[in-house]
């Protein structure tokens, strides 16, 4: 009798086998499908480095900035742990935006449960990143927390009380920092749980492919074809994170955040981390507080609408020439909003942000009708 393989002996090994070894995968995956596994890698790095940082961090408004300096100067290898954690967040968002962009371009949003879970994860990750940005308690951390939390006051009737509840007082202070640290420690584990659900939904429906067609009869096992490809991606990701952390450690940071928080001195220009800038530019482009908050929320929540606007012959934009160019115009608008969000609130940056914000939302309004128009002429 043939000996049973180890990966079939227990239910746990069977789950791992179904995810990493015998998973049926389309044979025409491109490198754009590597970003999902890279997100898992960087999330693991963030969890490990974050736990080590939490061992030495003090969530007290008088000590937090000094505790970060202590980690950099006095803790064994603390400097590299802190730099990898800070720069790893940037690489996580690079992979995340590429992953979302790939899903939008190739029509992966038609796997509705997987897409909705992914968008929820995106919002949760942005919340975790904002909470983490506040923890060093530098100038930009303090004033960024003040500005962003104040946005909740735009909610009618309950906004003011909600802000005071978040602050734990009448201004951003020690209670706020303690709450943000607690949530920042918790949320990544919720993200990990959500990622498992995301993978579960993905493997229930099967992966999309560049052509956006059903290819159940033309699949190959994940290992060794795509596992080797992922390992190559892991190597490059490790290389870039280490390269930035060793040679350009503060390239993606904000200089004002190396100054201890001072409630009596407002920075000349309050800027969040670069991965929030596109939403921040949309917020600033609307000359009304409530309108700006709604614009910021819609910039994220509009991703939920994509499965509702699709009723076409093909999933992938690669098969629609007009939609293909329209998608790249959307990418340009995203990049220009990111650049505009880092500029002072003055002309011509405000006007440019308004134009690019309109183009950003126009994509979601017209992408469905454009494909219907092209289907008519096919």
From Swiss-Prot:
Key words, A-Z: Electron transport, Heme, Iron, Membrane, Metal-binding, Mitochondrion, Mitochondrion inner membrane, Respiratory chain, Transmembrane, Transmembrane helix, Transport, Ubiquinone
GO cellular component terms given for this protein: mitochondrial inner membrane; respiratory chain complex III
Residues the record lists as binding heme b b562: 85, 184
Record's subcellular location: Mitochondrion inner membrane
Subunit: The main subunits of complex b-c1 are: cytochrome b, cytochrome c1 and the Rieske protein.
CDD domains referenced in this protein's UniProt entry, alphabetically: cytochrome_b_C (cd00290), Cytochrome_b_N (cd00284)
PANTHER family in UniProt: CYTOCHROME B
A Pfam family matched in the record: Cytochrome_B
Residues that hold a ubiquinone according to the record: 203
Cofactor binding note from Swiss-Prot or TrEMBL: Binds 2 heme b groups non-covalently.
InterPro entries: Cyt_b/b6_C, Cyt_b/b6_C_sf, Cyt_b/b6_N, Cytb/b6-like_sf, Cytochrome_b, Cytochrome_b_C_euk/bac, Cytochrome_b_N_euk/bac, Di-haem_cyt_TM
Signal peptide (from-to): none
Annotated membrane topology: Multi-pass membrane protein
Gene Ontology BP terms: mitochondrial electron transport, ubiquinol to cytochrome c
SUPFAM superfamilies linked: a domain/subunit of cytochrome bc1 complex (Ubiquinol-cytochrome c reductase) (SSF81648), Transmembrane di-heme cytochromes (SSF81342)
Protein name: Cytochrome b
